């Protein structure tokens, strides 16, 4: 729960710090509204001719990036272990027994879906990556302060 509060605060801070909202084309808005029908708290940003929507859907904080023609390029979702595919969760629990899942970042692009999972134990933080098949790789390890 603490991780969701932190992510929500970060999301809110970034939203408040944003400048004037960009003019989002009708193509982009239509594409977004068709794909994310139940999105709430939508905030738009424009960078280098790309449009990024930050929003919540089913209580999951998400981002979607579109080009000017309304093509969805990438989505990012931030959530807890409850939304992680069960086969990946089971592999993590087996391989990293004794560590708890702090949060999940899911990246979805044309070439597939990847998961960046932050784990913790009493002494360390761990970042592991998984593909949609559940192949796990430890990418970072940090000592807690």
Regions found by a protein language model. Name each.
Residues 19-145:
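Interaction-mediating elements
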Residues 4-14:
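Sec-dependent N-terminal signal peptides
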């Amino acid at each position: 729960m603490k991780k969701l509060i932190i992510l929500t605060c970060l999301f809110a801070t970034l939203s408040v710090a944003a400048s004037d909202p960009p003019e989002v084309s009708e193509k982009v808005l239509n594409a977004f509204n068709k794909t994310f029908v139940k999105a709430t708290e939508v905030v738009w940003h424009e960078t280098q001719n790309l449009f990024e929507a930050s929003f919540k859907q089913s209580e999951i904080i998400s981002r979607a990036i579109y080009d000017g023609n309304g093509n969805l390029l990438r989505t990012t979702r931030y959530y807890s272990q409850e939304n992680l595919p069960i086969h990946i969760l089971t592999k993590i629990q087996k391989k990293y027994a004794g560590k708890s899942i702090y949060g999940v970042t899911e990246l979805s692009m044309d070439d597939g879906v990847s998961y960046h999972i932050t784990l913790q134990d009493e002494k360390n933080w761990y970042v592991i990556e998984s593909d949609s098949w559940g192949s796990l790789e430890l990418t970072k390890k940090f000592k807690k302060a």
